[in-house]
Amino acid sequence: MTEPTRPAVRVLGRGRMGSALADALDGAGWNVDLVPGRGAHVAAAARDVSLVMLCVPDGAVAEVAAKVSASPPGASATEPGAVIAHTAGALTLGVLAPHARRAGLHPLVSVPAGPGGAASLRGAWMALAGDPLIDSVAQALQGRTFRVADERRAAYHAAAAISANHLVALMGQAERVAASADVPAEAMLNLAAGALDQVRER
């Protein structure tokens, strides 16, 4: 009995997100090719794969997407073409406009560097958009998913920023005030964790 063909994905960008996503998908049985996000090779990134994940800085997504050839050398004219996807929380699918098949996957998690990156993606909440193939990526990562339409992207990203960035800034302020009264920062963190648990249980 022949083994089923493993889905093929090319990940552009070797930063935290790209490395973590590549490791996680490789562990889930995907055929993964992790390459730098810039260089002459980008033009042929869609060749021989069903999915190209752009894991580059938000400001570079449109530029890199435009450099990926929709019909790379060697591709059959009858092939539907690879899905081009990004992992940016703030960007719509419009930045991938040169391509007919587009998608987005934004994990709602802080991805650490190193071996822990892949583990952080497994089971994480993920915002999906576009081509249904992206659902297969989320399923491979055992992600908990929801879909966000382009017209609601700004509101989604604002909510994510409030939940993460604003909370970090607020706790930093609380720690500084606590320090002025010789109160351990751990006490404030424990208090905040309890408050968040109550919010979760509402």
Language-model segment annotations:
Residues 1-48:
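NAD(P)+-binding Rossmann beta1-loop-alpha1 motif at the extreme N-terminus of oxidoreductases
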Residues 5-8, 81, 123:
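Phosphate-coordination loops involved in phosphoryl transfer and adenosine-cofactor binding
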Residues 9, 32-33, 102, 145, ...:
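Hydrophobic anchor at the start of a short beta-strand
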Residues 9-11, 54, 128:
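Hydrophobic Val/Ile/Leu positions in short beta-strands of Rossmann-like dinucleotide-binding domains
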Residues 19, 23, 39-117:
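Rossmann-like NAD(P)(H) cofactor-binding subdomain of soluble oxidoreductases
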Residues 21, 28, 116-201:
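Internal alpha-helical scaffold of NAD(P)-dependent oxidoreductase catalytic cores
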Residues 29-32, 81, 99-101, 142:
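A generic structural signal for alpha->beta connector loops
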Residues 34, 86, 104, 127-128, ...:
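Structural signal for conserved beta-strand scaffold positions within catalytic alpha/beta enzyme cores
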